[in-house]
Amino acid sequence: MELKLIQGCVSEDRVSQRQLFETYGNKFMAICKRYMQDDMLAEDVLMESFFKIYKNIKKFKGEGSFEGWMRRIVVNTAIDHINKKNKSVLRYCEEVKDEAAVLPEVINNLSTKELMLMVCELPVGCRTVFNMFVMDGFTHKQISEHLKIPEGTSKWHMSKARILLQNKLKRYESDIRI
């Protein structure tokens, strides 16, 4: 099934391209929304990603997962978009106080959607590094290369993202206790 779909897209068959989009569009839109705060920007990144997938599908050699290959294009497109729009923002993330850890039961009571909304509220630099490191498995070295920032800055953004999320979780915890 997947091989036939790939071959159809290589041949620029519109039905195959539509089927590929319908099969993976929602999954990849979730990735785009993790990186972009605005749904319209997320849709733009998704469309640009599929354009790149269709354009470069001939380069897929069948080594590894096809979905993984496409996912990398989606993530890289989102990162490229952030780099273009926010060159200076990636170098700065607001300073916050480090507080005690959040109770594990608070995290367990959160839905995935609620947690992802908290991640989306992070400043762009922190959110981008958090997504790349935690969600997409990049190392700090890879993040620094992709975002063209020092490796230490990547680690700093990750640390600040963790602190900001802890603060959000504490506010959530105090809200549910009231």
Task: Describe the function of each predicted region.
Residues 58-62, 72-92, 160:
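Arg/Lys-rich amphipathic alpha helix in sigma70-family domain 2
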Residues 87-112, 139:
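Internal acidic/polar
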